């Protein structure tokens, strides 16, 4: 059992001293626990510094190993530079006109989640049936989270493989979720997690992430003549024509 009144997370961390932590065949050796059967999801590279054992709300146990001296091969140079605009209708739109779908994993599972939560509310407190209902909800949340993480990892890896420099906007999701009409959609999109993945993977693979100031008027700027039209401050304007050169723009591609 995990016991920590100051931390809601169910986890503990052990430092590696000598060979008290090591990966075996279909098992991992941990201090005080010995060899514990497990499914190895990734090849362990480098020297192990510590192991963190955790349990998620659905009752599954995980071991995360912190390693050093692990070499990551840089990706081949492509010479490509793109800008990425994050959104809700499309998860992201690149400056070369490619729109990446927003799968809205939470929204797709909301009806099922609401049904399970209603069932939970009818169960007697402290009963085994209530624990089972709570576990079902935790497993659904885990499924939604895994879907989202899988998409973010695949998309971030793809963009870094295809481009040397990626420009992204310095968004402030914490401020944006104050809009209650968009809060759930913004949280479901996980823009901050996507940026985090891009930044650490870029460092791994020898690529570069450029963060653009959030007040830079990219949606108002004409890419043809560099003129600025303030009419796009109205978010309902999705397409506009530059009054200077007559070039037509999609606000997401700009």
Tell what function each PLM region has.
Residues 1-56:
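Acidic carboxylate diad motif detector
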Residues 42-47, 55-254:
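Positively charged, helix-rich recognition surfaces that bind polyanionic ligands
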């Amino acid at each position: 059992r995990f016991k920590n009144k100051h931390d809601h997370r169910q986890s503990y961390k052990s430092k590696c001293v000598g060979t008290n932590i090591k990966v075996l065949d279909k098992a991992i050796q941990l201090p005080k626990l010995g060899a514990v059967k497990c499914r190895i999801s990734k090849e362990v590279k480098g020297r192990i510094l510590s192991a963190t054992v955790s349990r998620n709300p659905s009752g599954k146990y995980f071991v995360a190993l912190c390693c050093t001296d692990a070499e990551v091969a840089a990706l081949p140079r492509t010479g490509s530079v793109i800008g990425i605009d994050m959104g809700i209708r499309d998860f992201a739109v690149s400056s070369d006109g490619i729109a990446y779908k927003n799968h809205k994993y939470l929204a797709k599972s909301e009806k099922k989640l609401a049904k399970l939560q209603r069932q939970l509310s009818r169960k007697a407190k402290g009963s085994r049936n209530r624990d089972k209902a709570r576990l079902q909800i935790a497993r659904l949340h885990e499924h939604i989270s895994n879907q989202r993480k899988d998409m973010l990892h695949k998309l971030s890896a793809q963009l870094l493989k295809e481009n040397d420099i990626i420009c992204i906007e310095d968004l402030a999701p914490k401020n944006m979720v104050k809009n209650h009409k968009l809060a759930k959609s913004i949280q479901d999109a996980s823009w901050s997690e996507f940026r985090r993945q891009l930044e650490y993977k870029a460092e791994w693979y020898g690529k570069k992430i450029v963060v653009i100031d959030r007040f830079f008027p990219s949606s108002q700027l004409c890419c043809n003549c560099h003129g600025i039209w303030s009419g796009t401050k109205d978010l309902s304007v999705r397409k506009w024509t530059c009054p200077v050169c007559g070039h037509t723009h999609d606000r997401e591609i700009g």
